[in-house]
């Protein structure tokens, strides 16, 4: 987490007041000792062909004109924990910052399809449209499932990962706070899924977000869907 969020949690949960600058110095010290690492950049995805199929190219739309559940960003990353390499799929909702994540043994379109179906079952908001990059995992069966569900599927232009910045930042958060966390001892996909479910719940119901005025994603959704 950033130094500002750490300071808020310390004050909120432990009644300990530490300045952001002090938190920053502690974080810098840990970084200098090699105890904090950054997420590695991923290789560029291949171009998407829009001549056939359900997907359509991404077009600019003002954030203020979007509704809850519109252009939900989905992405995947490769991660290794305790010798187990997994494909981590994640969805990020722009308005509430709500995320859902799941892991699979491969990053094929079948996995992306399974993830989409699971997301639709657990999301506490109506999913109106999906936004992805041009990766092959978001073609074939994934695209067909979006069409079957009548979900708009928008694909980013090549070399524009910043347009999926929300889910990219969420990926980095889970790489640092989950996969790089030494206290998590899970060493199988099943055990990692169990721990990941708990980590996702904590992110959505406990972690404060300054973009939400200190509220959690679930608090934001409850207020705005009331």
Q: Where does each model-flagged region fall?
A:
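Active-site beta-loop-alpha junctions of metal-dependent nucleic acid enzymes
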Residues: 84, 101-125, 129
């Amino acid at each position: 987490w950033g130094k500002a969020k750490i300071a808020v949690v310390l004050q909120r949960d432990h009644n300990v007041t530490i300045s952001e600058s002090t938190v920053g110095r502690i974080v810098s010290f840990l970084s200098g000792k090699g105890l904090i690492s950054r997420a590695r950049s991923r290789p560029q995805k291949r171009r998407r062909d829009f001549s056939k199929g359900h997907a359509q190219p991404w077009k600019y739309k003002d954030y203020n004109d979007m509704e809850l559940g519109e252009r939900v960003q989905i992405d995947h990353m490769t991660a290794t924990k305790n010798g187990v390499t997994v494909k981590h799929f994640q969805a990020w909702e722009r308005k509430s910052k709500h995320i859902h994540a799941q892991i699979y043994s491969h990053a094929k379109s079948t996995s992306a399809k399974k993830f989409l179906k699971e997301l639709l079952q657990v999301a506490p908001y109506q999913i109106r449209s999906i936004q992805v990059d041009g990766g092959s995992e978001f073609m074939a069966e994934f695209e067909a499932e979006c069409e079957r569900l009548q979900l708009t599927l928008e694909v980013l232009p090549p070399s524009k990962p910043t347009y999926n910045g929300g889910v990219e930042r969420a990926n980095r958060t889970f790489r640092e706070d989950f996969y790089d966390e030494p206290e998590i001892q899970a060493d199988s996909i099943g055990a990692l899924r169990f721990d990941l479910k708990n980590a996702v719940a904590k992110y959505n119901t406990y972690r404060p977000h300054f973009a939400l005025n200190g509220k959690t994603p679930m608090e934001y959704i409850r207020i705005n869907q009331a």
